[in-house]
Amino acid sequence: MTDQQKRSRIHRWLGVVATLAVLGTVAVATGPATTTAQAGPGREDTAPRHRDAVQRSLDELVRADDFPAALASVRERDGRVRHYTAGVADLRTRAKVPTDGYVRIGSNTKTYLAVVVLQLVGEGRIGLDEPVETYLPGLVRGDGVDGRRITVRQLLQHTSGLPNYTALLPETYELIRHRYVQPRELLDMGLSQQATDEPGGTFAYSNTNYVVAGLLVERVTGRPVREEITNRIITPLGLRHTYFPNVGDQEVRRPHPNGYHRDRPEQPLTDVTVMDPSMGWAAGQVVATPSDLNRFFTALLGGELLGPGQLRQMRDTVDAPGPLPGSRYGLGLQSTPMSCGGLAWGHGGNIFGYSTVNAVTDDGRAATIAATRLPTDLAEVEHLLAALDTALCG
């Protein structure tokens, strides 16, 4: 395997394919699973056919794709919420998967950060079409990279041309699993590579964009990104099961399914639940439950976090080529056509140990599917997305 192939594989694992939203069909099978349906106090689940289809899709992820566990939270148009699980939380003890357990949500963090930036835009403290240089003078410079020519909008929309720092992370995960990485180190890794395009060019997903956006937020507000996301989003929405881990916090709060990883498909799985998530920072560090993730995206699309003008900007998309036809990317938000018609809005995220796909619709549906290892090929990604489509379209 060449160095470029190794980098491409890590690049894929850390969020490129996982930012894609929803499309596909799902196979049917059975496997070890548990199901919990919750629709609020005293309300009965009246959609067994849809419920069974979602459960079968999770069972198939465990049986056919060998994900240790899969879990889902689905919100219907009428507000009913149902939770699903399949597999086991711990491969050693065979413990039951906790209903709506905590997972690392990876690149979904980008949407939280984009909301913070857009709130600051609404407050007149950041200009979307201002150059990055205005806020971070002299910081963003490299081979074909110049912060004087890159706007804040281009950062959030992945049209800046900034190269992706994850391409230079070590191939062997254990080398960095417990190491704290400074945000400036992540930026330096990105800037050590050549620009991928001119600013304002084609969409090219790069975690480096959101490292720069995080540094920009800290410079403008004088506070850590963690505090801004907590104070502006998590606390106001009452997201009691969402948090941005503090420096040195390597645990995932309980209850959670364990996360697993292998560097190559032929290797045995290693428990990587305990890890330093700083390699993701403002691009991928948040932890949440599936239902909290649904609540966040539902609130966002419902206008609870941004004014109408900022939300319109967020939903103004460019073509985002990838394995899903019709996918488009806005400002930290992706849209994808659903098999049942209409658009799904979400993001998705991969980080070592966990993969999440999620989306909400304009009519109030929301779904998050989480699996407890990273997909290792495109087929597994498609199966995760198919499970999400089943949850939204039934």
Residue ranges and their predicted role:
Residues 53, 69, 127-131, 147, ...:
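Alpha-helix N-cap and coil->helix boundary residues
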Residues 2-3, 32-85, 270-394:
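Catalytic loop of the DD-peptidase/beta-lactamase superfamily, centered on the K-T-G motif
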Residues 1-39:
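Secretory targeting and sorting signals
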Residues 77, 89-91, 160-161:
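Solvent-exposed coil/turn segments that connect beta secondary-structure elements
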Residues 50, 54, 105, 109, ...:
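Hydrophobic (often cysteine-bearing) scaffold residues that line and stabilize catalytic clefts
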Residues 58, 78-79, 110-113, 117, ...:
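Residue-level preference for non-acidic, small/hydrophobic
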Residues 83, 143-344:
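Short, surface-exposed loop or secondary-structure junction motifs
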Residues 65-68, 92-153, 197-206, 281:
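Short active-site loop at a secondary-structure junction
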